[in-house]
């Protein structure tokens, strides 16, 4: 194993936090000066290699492996895809409500959840899991939301009727006993 491959492996595992010069030097039993030379070689290797997406950066004596600037657009698009970014519990709740009650307004969703759902709706719209499906014919004409074809693909189903059936949940006996009034 070369020093370059060892440095690369350590920085890869360290991820976003990176490693300090002192920590790297102690792990590799190198002097700071010798390590600096190895880091410079690694940095030059990445700069010259057009087939590598990586580069080495140093911030306040901490070194990290990051992707080259030219990949920013590609990585931004990747990060926005639902398959590669987990949905929050709130987003999953809203998505479930829309899937089973569509078309439905934000206010109706808020009433079911008991909290504001605007943020979750925005995220689901951005991920193309839901869409605006017209306006409700009431005062204020609020938007109606429904799932998209992409939602069906994401869930691995062909039709909404393939969603699992949700029955009204019966409260457990312990819960019923808890809320009984004692005379």
Curated annotation (Swiss-Prot):
- Show the disulfide pairing: none
| Superkingdom | Bacteria
Q: Which InterPro entries match?
A: ScpB_csome_segregation (IPR005234), WH-like_DNA-bd_sf (IPR036388), WH_DNA-bd_sf (IPR036390)
Places the protein is found: Cytoplasm
Q: Which GO terms describe its cellular component?
A: cytoplasm
Give the function comment from the record.
Participates in chromosomal partition during cell division. May act via the formation of a condensin-like complex containing Smc and ScpA that pull DNA away from mid-cell into both cell halves.
Query: What name has this protein been given in UniProt?
Result: Segregation and condensation protein B
Native organism is Streptococcus pyogenes serotype M12 (strain MGAS2096)
């Amino acid at each position: 194993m070369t020093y370059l491959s060892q440095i690369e492996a350590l920085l890869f595992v360290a991820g976003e936090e990176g490693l300090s010069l002192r920590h790297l030097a102690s792990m590799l039993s190198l002097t700071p000066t010798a390590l600096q030379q190895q880091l410079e070689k690694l940095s030059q290797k990445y700069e010259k290699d057009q087939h590598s997406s990586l580069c080495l950066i140093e911030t306040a004596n901490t070194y990290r492996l990051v992707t080259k600037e030219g990949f920013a657009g590609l990585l931004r698009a990747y990060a926005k895809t639902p398959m590669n970014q987990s949905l929050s519990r709130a987003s999953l709740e809203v998505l479930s409500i829309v899937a089973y009650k569509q078309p439905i307004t934000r206010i109706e969703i808020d009433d079911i959840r008991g909290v504001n759902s605007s943020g979750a709706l925005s995220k689901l719209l951005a991920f193309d899991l839901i869409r605006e499906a017209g306006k409700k014919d009431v005062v204020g004409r609020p938007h109606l939301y429904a799932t998209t074809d992409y939602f069906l693909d994401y869930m691995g189903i062909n039709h909404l009727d393939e969603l699992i059936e949700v029955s009204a949940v019966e409260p457990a006996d312990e819960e019923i006993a808890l809320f009984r009034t004692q005379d």
